[in-house]
Amino acid sequence: MSQVNMRDMLKAGVHFGHQTRYWNPKMGKYIFGARNKIHIINLEKTLPMFNEALTFVERLAQGKNKILFVGTKRSAGKIVAEEAARCGSPYVDHRWLGGMLTNFKTIRASIKRLRDLEVQAEDGTFAKLTKKEALMRSRDLEKLDRSLGGIKDMGGLPDALFVIDVDHERIAITEANKLGIPVIGVVDTNSSPEGVDYIIPGNDDAIRAIQLYMGSMADAVIRGRNHVAGGTEQFVEEAPVAAAE
């Protein structure tokens, strides 16, 4: 099982927190000290917590469960979309719509609308409309795809959330908490860890750090799914041998 190590985190700047004046006392036990008025996160505490979260995600993936990746701020969006797509997981990279979990019935209707518009765009329906109507539908399609494109294949509520910047995604965390959906979150020194089941104390702004979190989580999903596939193949191969004996 491949896990994150101290060198990976140091190289990515995971240990750099926020300015000391913005700190949240609830994160005090994860802070090593301060340098130039910047809090330094204790990576000796982050390391086992990060790896525990990865193990949890890998086990979820083994059970064919869905992990929803959430990162809507500018520095995270692109990385979230790319890594989620790499491991075939749903994601929200643009803006969290209120009720995305707690009012999923309405969201499902919007996803159906998105799919209908995608079909119309491909089958020539748009070309048969007036320019004004075609433009309106194209804009509607673009808007829905930006908001819901990452979850259109989710099929139902996710089994866990992985969140970059828990302050920025507090609405998503609150909705997950209401529904009993486990939350894994990167929590910086200025944030509150409340509502997060698997806390990863770390820098939630640096692109290299976000790449490490997302890449590691995507790898964990892939490992979990490959473990299931590998286990099935191994069983099929061993069955004839057992029969021969």
From Swiss-Prot:
Any one cellular-component term (Gene Ontology): cytosolic small ribosomal subunit
Matches recorded under InterPro entries: Ribosomal_uS2, Ribosomal_uS2_bac/mit/plastid, Ribosomal_uS2_CS, Ribosomal_uS2_flav_dom_sf
Pfam families to which the protein is assigned, alphabetical: Ribosomal_S2
Keywords associated with the record: Ribonucleoprotein, Ribosomal protein
Entry keyword annotation includes Ribosomal protein: yes
GO BP terms in the entry: translation
Family: Belongs to the universal ribosomal protein uS2 family.
Protein name: Small ribosomal subunit protein uS2
Species of provenance: Pseudomonas fluorescens (strain SBW25)
